[in-house]
């Protein structure tokens, strides 16, 4: 049994400081992950067991005509990792594929079948790397689904008809229905209303190849001994690469990502390292081997004063509407999120992270709410999702349901956004 736990967070009693740790150091308590599950199917029509997930997973990402046509290959499920509740019931399944791609699916048909997905990247469950705020996101969903399974939440929405491979493939592929389709008659077919993104093409990280000009602290975790760049600097750098501004950098030689054959000391990676060093210095980065942190609210002024951007604004209000407006206008944003710990009556902000959001989509589905004993009231519902680039070499990048509000799973403490970034 593999656990995501055993580590303890060093508390940071500050309000706005973002420390982006390579080691999550988060005690998850009962949040457990396994690769094999052998439990009896519960006497509950809403419960989704691992065999049903496996059947769906084997059908969805494994054809050449849906998600992997651009690769021209068929894909295979690498592993299915259930996350369990305190009662030892599966609440969430994380499905990873051999050639890239993942799903995060709930174990209950009263919830929309796809909580997050990517057709390229994997959702790595390595406890030494997974960011604390993503663990918090999983915990929040785990708690919500556990309450739903125990009857603590009287949720009467029925998503069961959406739990099939055809619906999920159409949802991911972004199928647009005929304009003549009457409202409310979509049935099992989702309709893509809007999609834009991901806008950036970089999948940069914080380690070797990006930290070539960070302070040399003799870090054992890095072969070059240098500190991590920090998630704030990595997010800033990816945004500036999107704009190719300012012109004091050679943008054309910067590689979009690192792979096993990359020369991390090449001119291109050194140019990225220069950019990330300058970004870190502009926000007074506090460098470390496992954690390099800075204050995200300083990013907007740094972009204007140090990198000659005409505008950039930081706020903690109306974040979702600002994400949607910016991406619809063709601009990515930087987000901040973390988790709250109450200690001795004080609110402590810990496990923070800054990352890029550069995609937004809306899909129309039909949902049915139970009315009385036998009846259902069916109507249309918009399901929004957001593309997240977390700044860890592509790990965990993908489309997520609403990150800041909703019934299940949020990065919902000390939220912030840097938007209106214009050169």
PLM regions with names:
Residues 70-109:
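Exposed beta-strand-loop-beta-strand "reactive/processing" segments of non-cytosolic proteins
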Residues 1-9:
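Bacterial N-terminal signal peptides that target proteins for export
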Residues 106-151, 394-404:
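A short, surface-exposed interaction/processing loop segment used at functional sites
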Residues 1, 13-42:
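Bacterial Sec-dependent N-terminal signal peptides
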Residues 39-86:
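Short, non-transmembrane alpha-helical segments in secretory-pathway proteins
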Residues 23, 122, 129-292:
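Active-site-adjacent structural segments surrounding the nucleophilic cysteine of cysteine proteases
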Residues 398-423:
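Low-complexity, Gly/Ser/Thr/Pro-rich intrinsically disordered linker/tail segments
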């Amino acid at each position: 049994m593999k656990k995501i736990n055993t580590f303890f967070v060093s508390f940071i009693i500050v309000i706005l400081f973002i420390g982006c740790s390579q080691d999550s150091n988060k005690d998850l308590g009962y949040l457990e992950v396994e690769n094999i599950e052998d439990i009896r199917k519960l006497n509950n029509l809403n419960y989704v067991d691992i065999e049903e997930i496996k059947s769906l997973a084997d059908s969805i990402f494994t054809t050449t005509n849906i998600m992997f046509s651009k690769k021209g290959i068929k894909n295979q499920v690498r592993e299915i990792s259930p996350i369990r509740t305190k009662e030892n019931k599966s609440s969430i399944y994380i499905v990873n594929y051999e050639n890239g791609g993942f799903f995060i699916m709930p174990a209950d048909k009263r919830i929309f079948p796809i909580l997050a997905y990517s057709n390229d990247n994997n959702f790595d469950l390595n406890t030494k790397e997974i960011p604390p705020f993503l663990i918090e996101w999983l915990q929040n969903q785990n708690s919500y689904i556990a309450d739903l399974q125990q009857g603590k939440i009287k949720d009467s929405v029925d998503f069961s008809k959406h739990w099939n491979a055809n619906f999920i493939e159409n949802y991911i592929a972004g199928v647009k229905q005929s304009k003549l389709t009457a409202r409310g008659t979509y049935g099992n077919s989702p309709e893509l209303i809007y999609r834009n993104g991901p806008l950036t093409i970089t999948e940069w990280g914080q380690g070797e190849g990006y930290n070539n000009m960070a302070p040399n602290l003799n870090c054992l975790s890095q072969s070059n001994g240098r500190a991590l760049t920090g998630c704030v600097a990595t997010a800033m750098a990816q945004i500036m690469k999107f704009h190719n501004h300012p012109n004091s950098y050679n943008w054309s030689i910067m590689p979009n990502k690192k792979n096993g054959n990359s020369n991390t000391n090449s001119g291109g990676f050194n140019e990225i390292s220069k950019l990330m060093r300058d970004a870190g210095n502009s926000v007074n980065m506090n460098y470390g081997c496992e954690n390099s942190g800075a204050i995200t609210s300083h990013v907007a002024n740094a972009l204007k004063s140090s990198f000659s951007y005409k505008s950039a604004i930081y706020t903690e209000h109306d974040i979702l509407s600002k994400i949607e407006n910016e991406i619809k206008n063709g601009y990515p944003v930087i987000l901040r999120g973390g988790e709250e710990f109450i200690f001795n009556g004080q609110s402590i902000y810990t496990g923070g992270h800054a990352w890029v959001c550069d995609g937004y989509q809306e899909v129309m589905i039909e949902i049915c709410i139970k009315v009385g004993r036998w009846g259902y009231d069916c109507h249309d519902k918009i399901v929004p999702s957001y593309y997240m680039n977390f700044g860890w070499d592509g790990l965990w990048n993908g489309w997520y349901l609403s990150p800041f509000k909703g019934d299940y799973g949020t990065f919902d403490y000390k939220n912030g956004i840097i938007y209106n970034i214009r050169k």
